[in-house]
Amino acid sequence: MDSSNCKVIAPLLSQRYRRMVTKDGHSTLQMDGAQRGLAYLRDAWGILMDMRWRWMMLVFSASFVVHWLVFAVLWYVLAEMNGDLELDHDAPPENHTICVKYITSFTAAFSFSLETQLTIGYGTMFPSGDCPSAIALLAIQMLLGLMLEAFITGAFVAKIARPKNRAFSIRFTDTAVVAHMDGKPNLIFQVANTRPSPLTSVRVSAVLYQERENGKLYQTSVDFHLDGISSDECPFFIFPLTYYHSITPSSPLATLLQHENPSHFELVVFLSAMQEGTGEICQRRTSYLPSEIMLHHCFASLLTRGSKGEYQIKMENFDKTVPEFPTPLVSKSPNRTDLDIHINGQSIDNFQISETGLTE
């Protein structure tokens, strides 16, 4: 086979993995050959925040166990150096000062290390005030233990309070549609805030990713607007919002959506919003493939009125689409419209709809 006739296929969007960003916003890209040295380990806080909860719990549990074991070894070494392991602690020699009472084995040393870190008082095992080495080691263990507990507590609070958790309540429609608005085609998707607390300063941006034959990804910005709002952001997000992209000849999607089976691309949508209570920015992402963009469809209605006149949101219709009925763009008269009748793909005749009925 002539290698010059072979196409170079980029591994980023191969036949097996056709999506860069999942529907819930996670990236599927994998870094092969990336070296994780000291520069990576310096960001220990970021590594912890990115960990899954099960790994985070494992790391924290291991940190406590290692801390207890290290100081258990130190307490055992102190008892060995002071000659306390072989003594009768109930009747010690008069000229001998026991540093820690009843540490006669490594098990006892580990128990004392655990007791020092987790309790506010001692039982039968306790350090002697006449042994400076024991007092110094006790102070070091307490200081490092408090630092470890503060770090772990802060990491738990930071992970729970991340704005990322608020973003999970933002929901995009599973599909986007291409429908006509004011006679012009528009790419449309909807987004909903599933929590009663509002979001403010909502911004939406989108990037179109296309794979070229040279193995590179080409990125194009796609602009979306919200109804008739002229500003770049929506000031209040409590009910579902509908975003539109006008498919004009200059639109990057114009040539891609002309056919029923367009070439592969991925449209990644980013929504950023501010939490009203905390002022923190959260971001939600999703992506749409060509198979997830429905031509000549529109979304079902979401807003209804209740018995008392209040607005109600029918979330069961959030992902529901209905076929778009074609509307004539040109009419011969205000009361007369041409209508072509097709049976099995064959044009039969031309009729006109008037106020009095169907005429030939």
Curated annotation (Swiss-Prot):
Membrane disposition? Multi-pass membrane protein
Q: Which ranges make up the Cytoplasmic topological domains here?
A: 1-50, 158-360
Q: Which GO terms describe its biological process?
A: potassium ion import across plasma membrane; potassium ion transport; regulation of monoatomic ion transmembrane transport
Q: What is the effect of changing M125R?
A: Increased channel activity and increased sensitivity to inhibition by Ba(2+)
User: Intramembrane ranges in this entry?
Assistant: 106-122
Cite a GO CC annotation: monoatomic ion channel complex
Q: Which GO terms describe its molecular function?
A: inward rectifier potassium channel activity
Location of motif Selectivity filter in this chain is 119-124
Q: Which reaction does it catalyse?
A: K(+)(in) = K(+)(out)
**Function per UniProt:** Inward rectifier potassium channels are characterized by a greater tendency to allow potassium to flow into the cell rather than out of it. Their voltage dependence is regulated by the concentration of extracellular potassium; as external potassium is raised, the voltage range of the channel opening shifts to more positive voltages. The inward rectification is mainly due to the blockage of outward current by internal magnesium.
| Record text on subunit structure and interactions | Homotetramer. Interacts with RAB28; the interaction may facilitate cone outer segments phagocytosis.
Q: What protein is this chain from?
A: Inward rectifier potassium channel 13
Species of the source? Homo sapiens (Human)
